[in-house]
Protein backbone atom coordinates (compact mmCIF):
# COMPACT_ATOMS: atom_id res chain seq x y z
CA UNK A 1 0.00 0.00 0.00
CA UNK A 2 1.19 3.46 -0.87
CA UNK A 3 2.03 6.05 1.81
CA UNK A 4 -0.74 8.56 2.36
CA UNK A 5 0.03 12.02 3.67
CA UNK A 6 -2.40 14.00 5.72
CA UNK A 7 -1.68 17.71 5.92
CA UNK A 8 -2.92 19.82 8.81
CA UNK A 9 -2.41 23.40 9.89
CA UNK A 10 -0.12 23.76 12.89
CA UNK A 11 0.44 27.27 14.24
CA UNK A 12 4.06 27.80 15.29
CA UNK A 13 4.17 29.04 18.87
CA UNK A 14 6.98 29.62 21.35
CA UNK A 15 7.06 27.23 24.30
CA UNK A 16 6.46 29.92 26.95
CA UNK A 17 3.15 30.80 25.33
CA UNK A 18 2.16 27.10 25.35
CA UNK A 19 3.19 26.85 29.00
CA UNK A 20 1.03 29.89 29.87
CA UNK A 21 -1.93 28.42 27.91
CA UNK A 22 -1.71 25.09 29.76
CA UNK A 23 -1.46 26.88 33.10
CA UNK A 24 -4.54 29.05 32.38
CA UNK A 25 -6.57 26.05 31.19
CA UNK A 26 -5.73 24.03 34.32
CA UNK A 27 -6.45 27.01 36.60
CA UNK A 28 -9.92 27.55 35.10
CA UNK A 29 -10.65 23.81 35.09
CA UNK A 30 -9.65 23.05 38.68
CA UNK A 31 -9.53 26.33 40.64
CA UNK A 32 -12.07 28.82 39.24
CA UNK A 33 -14.27 25.99 37.81
CA UNK A 34 -15.27 28.18 34.82
CA UNK A 35 -14.07 25.43 32.47
CA UNK A 36 -14.91 22.40 34.62
CA UNK A 37 -16.42 20.45 31.67
CA UNK A 38 -13.18 20.71 29.71
CA UNK A 39 -10.90 17.68 29.51
CA UNK A 40 -7.10 17.92 29.64
CA UNK A 41 -4.99 15.05 28.24
CA UNK A 42 -1.31 14.93 29.22
CA UNK A 43 1.48 13.97 26.82
CA UNK A 44 1.91 10.55 28.44
CA UNK A 45 -1.79 9.75 27.78
CA UNK A 46 -1.45 10.39 24.04
CA UNK A 47 -0.32 7.63 21.65
CA UNK A 48 1.40 10.19 19.39
CA UNK A 49 4.96 11.09 20.54
CA UNK A 50 4.85 14.67 19.16
CA UNK A 51 1.69 15.69 21.08
CA UNK A 52 2.54 17.47 24.32
CA UNK A 53 -1.09 18.00 25.43
CA UNK A 54 -4.72 18.04 24.29
CA UNK A 55 -7.60 20.13 25.58
CA UNK A 56 -11.09 18.87 24.69
CA UNK A 57 -13.78 21.56 24.99
CA UNK A 58 -17.40 20.30 24.67
CA UNK A 59 -19.60 22.51 22.44
CA UNK A 60 -23.05 20.96 22.59
CA UNK A 61 -22.88 17.76 20.50
CA UNK A 62 -19.54 18.82 19.01
CA UNK A 63 -16.21 19.53 20.64
CA UNK A 64 -13.14 21.64 20.06
CA UNK A 65 -9.78 19.84 20.35
CA UNK A 66 -6.69 21.98 20.84
CA UNK A 67 -3.46 20.00 20.56
CA UNK A 68 -0.01 21.32 21.42
CA UNK A 69 3.01 19.75 19.76
CA UNK A 70 6.71 19.54 20.50
CA UNK A 71 9.68 18.20 18.54
CA UNK A 72 8.48 19.58 15.20
CA UNK A 73 10.87 20.86 12.54
CA UNK A 74 12.07 24.32 13.47
CA UNK A 75 10.89 27.32 11.50
CA UNK A 76 12.88 29.92 9.66
CA UNK A 77 13.55 31.93 12.84
CA UNK A 78 15.75 30.82 15.73
CA UNK A 79 12.91 31.16 18.28
CA UNK A 80 10.74 28.67 16.35
CA UNK A 81 11.92 25.76 18.46
CA UNK A 82 9.60 23.11 17.11
CA UNK A 83 6.50 23.97 19.18
CA UNK A 84 3.06 24.22 17.60
CA UNK A 85 -0.72 24.21 18.09
CA UNK A 86 -3.54 22.71 16.02
CA UNK A 87 -7.23 23.56 16.50
CA UNK A 88 -9.87 21.07 15.39
CA UNK A 89 -13.69 21.05 15.54
CA UNK A 90 -15.23 17.55 15.78
CA UNK A 91 -18.78 16.27 15.61
CA UNK A 92 -19.31 12.51 15.50
CA UNK A 93 -17.15 11.26 12.59
CA UNK A 94 -16.67 14.68 10.96
CA UNK A 95 -13.77 16.96 11.84
CA UNK A 96 -12.35 20.16 10.39
CA UNK A 97 -9.67 22.61 11.36
CA UNK A 98 -10.65 26.10 12.53
CA UNK A 99 -8.70 29.29 12.98
CA UNK A 100 -8.01 30.79 16.44
CA UNK A 101 -10.58 33.59 16.06
CA UNK A 102 -13.42 31.16 15.30
CA UNK A 103 -12.29 28.89 18.13
CA UNK A 104 -12.54 31.79 20.59
CA UNK A 105 -16.03 32.66 19.30
CA UNK A 106 -17.19 29.05 19.70
CA UNK A 107 -15.84 28.91 23.25
CA UNK A 108 -17.57 32.22 24.01
CA UNK A 109 -20.94 30.95 22.71
CA UNK A 110 -20.98 27.96 25.06
CA UNK A 111 -19.10 29.26 28.11
CA UNK A 112 -18.67 32.44 30.15
CA UNK A 113 -21.14 35.24 30.88
CA UNK A 114 -21.41 37.99 28.29
CA UNK A 115 -22.66 41.53 28.22
CA UNK A 116 -23.71 41.19 24.60
CA UNK A 117 -25.80 43.05 22.04
CA UNK A 118 -28.93 41.44 23.49
CA UNK A 119 -28.22 43.34 26.73
CA UNK A 120 -29.44 46.57 25.07
CA UNK A 121 -32.88 45.10 24.36
CA UNK A 122 -33.05 43.50 27.83
CA UNK A 123 -32.11 46.78 29.53
CA UNK A 124 -34.80 48.69 27.59
CA UNK A 125 -37.40 46.07 28.59
CA UNK A 126 -36.33 46.36 32.23
CA UNK A 127 -34.72 42.92 32.49
CA UNK A 128 -31.59 42.30 34.53
CA UNK A 129 -28.50 42.24 32.34
CA UNK A 130 -25.09 40.71 32.92
CA UNK A 131 -22.79 43.65 33.75
CA UNK A 132 -19.75 42.45 31.81
CA UNK A 133 -18.29 40.01 29.33
CA UNK A 134 -15.98 37.46 30.92
CA UNK A 135 -14.39 36.39 27.64
CA UNK A 136 -13.41 39.42 25.55
CA UNK A 137 -11.30 37.26 23.20
CA UNK A 138 -14.54 35.86 21.75
CA UNK A 139 -15.51 39.23 20.23
CA UNK A 140 -13.99 40.14 16.88
CA UNK A 141 -15.99 43.19 15.86
CA UNK A 142 -16.80 46.64 17.16
CA UNK A 143 -20.25 46.86 18.71
CA UNK A 144 -23.01 49.37 17.94
CA UNK A 145 -22.97 52.85 19.49
CA UNK A 146 -25.63 51.76 22.01
CA UNK A 147 -23.52 48.77 23.00
CA UNK A 148 -20.37 50.89 23.34
CA UNK A 149 -22.29 53.42 25.47
CA UNK A 150 -23.56 50.68 27.80
CA UNK A 151 -20.10 49.13 28.13
CA UNK A 152 -18.65 52.57 28.92
CA UNK A 153 -21.29 53.00 31.64
CA UNK A 154 -20.52 49.64 33.25
CA UNK A 155 -16.78 49.19 33.69
CA UNK A 156 -15.58 45.65 32.88
CA UNK A 157 -14.19 43.68 35.79
CA UNK A 158 -10.70 42.30 35.18
CA UNK A 159 -10.42 38.56 35.79
CA UNK A 160 -7.17 37.34 37.31
CA UNK A 161 -5.77 35.19 35.80
CA UNK A 162 -7.29 35.84 32.35
CA UNK A 163 -9.32 33.20 30.57
CA UNK A 164 -7.39 31.08 28.04
CA UNK A 165 -7.68 32.54 24.53
CA UNK A 166 -6.81 30.41 21.51
CA UNK A 167 -6.19 33.54 19.43
CA UNK A 168 -3.73 34.83 22.03
CA UNK A 169 -2.03 31.41 22.11
CA UNK A 170 -1.38 31.41 18.36
CA UNK A 171 -0.60 35.14 18.05
CA UNK A 172 2.70 35.86 16.32
CA UNK A 173 4.56 38.38 18.46
CA UNK A 174 7.68 38.59 16.30
CA UNK A 175 6.37 38.72 12.77
CA UNK A 176 3.80 41.49 13.13
CA UNK A 177 3.41 43.35 9.81
CA UNK A 178 5.66 46.40 9.58
CA UNK A 179 3.94 49.79 9.59
CA UNK A 180 4.74 51.46 6.29
CA UNK A 181 5.12 55.20 6.19
CA UNK A 182 2.62 57.32 4.34
CA UNK A 183 3.40 59.37 1.23
CA UNK A 184 4.86 62.27 3.24
CA UNK A 185 7.04 60.10 5.46
CA UNK A 186 8.57 57.98 2.72
CA UNK A 187 12.16 59.03 2.09
CA UNK A 188 12.39 57.25 -1.25
CA UNK A 189 9.33 58.99 -2.66
CA UNK A 190 10.53 62.45 -1.58
CA UNK A 191 13.91 61.94 -3.24
CA UNK A 192 15.97 62.48 -0.05
Curated annotation (Swiss-Prot):
Residues 54-72 are annotated as: Interaction with host APOBEC3F and APOBEC3G. It comes from the Viruses. This is Virion infectivity factor. The lineage of its organism: Viruses, Riboviria, Pararnavirae, Artverviricota, Revtraviricetes. Processed in virion by the viral protease. Highly phosphorylated on serine and threonine residues. Residues 151-164 are annotated as: Multimerization. Counteracts the innate antiviral activity of host APOBEC3F and APOBEC3G by promoting their ubiquitination and degradation. Acts as a substrate recognition component of an E3 ubiquitin-protein ligase complex: mechanistically, Vif hijacks a host cullin-5-RING E3 ubiquitin-protein ligase complex (ECS complex) and the transcription coactivator CBFB/CBF-beta to form an active E3 ubiquitin-protein ligase complex that targets APOBEC3G and APOBEC3F for polyubiquitination, leading to their degradation by the proteasome. It holds the Pfam family Vif. The BC-like-box motif mediates the interaction with elongin BC complex. The HCCH motif (H-x(5)-C-x(18)-C-x(5)-H) mediates the interaction with CUL5. Zn(2+) binds at residues 108, 114, 133, 139. The keyword Nucleotidyltransferase does not apply. Its main location: host cell. Vif-defective viruses show catastrophic failure in reverse transcription due to APOBEC-induced mutations that initiate a DNA base repair pathway and compromise the structural integrity of the ssDNA. In the absence of Vif, the virion is morphologically abnormal. HIV-1 lineages are divided in three main groups, M (for Major), O (for Outlier), and N (for New, or Non-M, Non-O). The vast majority of strains found worldwide belong to the group M. Group O seems to be endemic to and largely confined to Cameroon and neighboring countries in West Central Africa, where these viruses represent a small minority of HIV-1 strains. The group N is represented by a limited number of isolates from Cameroonian persons. The group M is further subdivided in 9 clades or subtypes (A to D, F to H, J and K).
Amino acid sequence: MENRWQVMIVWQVDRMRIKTWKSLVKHHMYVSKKANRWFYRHHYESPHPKISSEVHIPLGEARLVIKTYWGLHTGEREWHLGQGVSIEWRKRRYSTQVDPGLADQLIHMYYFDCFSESAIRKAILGDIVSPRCEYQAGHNKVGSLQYLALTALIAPKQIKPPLPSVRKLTEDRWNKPQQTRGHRGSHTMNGH
